[in-house]
Amino acid sequence: MSRRLARETALQVLFQLEMTGESQDLKSAIHKWADEFAVPEGSIPFAEELAEGTLTHKEVIDENLEKLSEGWSLARMANVDRNLLRLASYEILFRKDIPGRVTINEAIEIAKRYGSEESGKFINGILDKVVESVNKKDEKGNDTLSRD
């Protein structure tokens, strides 16, 4: 299973659903994408989990991103960057089995492939703040970022 390919698949489907405004069944959309772009079967469950988790927690994720992305509203961000930040934030906030640094590195590489020339730096800066805020909350028990 390629986790990066699963992340890319989840990103593509989240992007597509947001851009088209479709309320298509998420799993169907992922399987359709996987069939069309020859995504290995082993990558699909992780892609489904990421996309579903991101959509389930979108309101909390967006709230947290708005707090941490000084000078940038989500609406002002490039569509790819916004959806990639949501996806990576889901991992950081809700998937404690994946180290934050791994998530950030993966997001930067995906941003380089799908985003603009500046996307990698932009994504890195905001996700560093997400990880830092989560770490502060874990250490001090304060409520810098909400997870639910």
Swiss-Prot record:
Involved in transcription antitermination. Required for transcription of ribosomal RNA (rRNA) genes. Binds specifically to the boxA antiterminator sequence of the ribosomal RNA (rrn) operons. One of its GO terms (biological process) is transcription antitermination. One of its GO terms (cellular component) is cytosol. It comes from Desulfitobacterium hafniense (strain Y51). Belongs to the NusB family. The keyword Transcription applies. GO terms for molecular function: RNA binding. This is Transcription antitermination protein NusB. Disulfide bonds: none annotated. Keywords: RNA-binding, Transcription, Transcription antitermination, Transcription regulation. Pfam families: NusB. Signal peptide: none annotated.
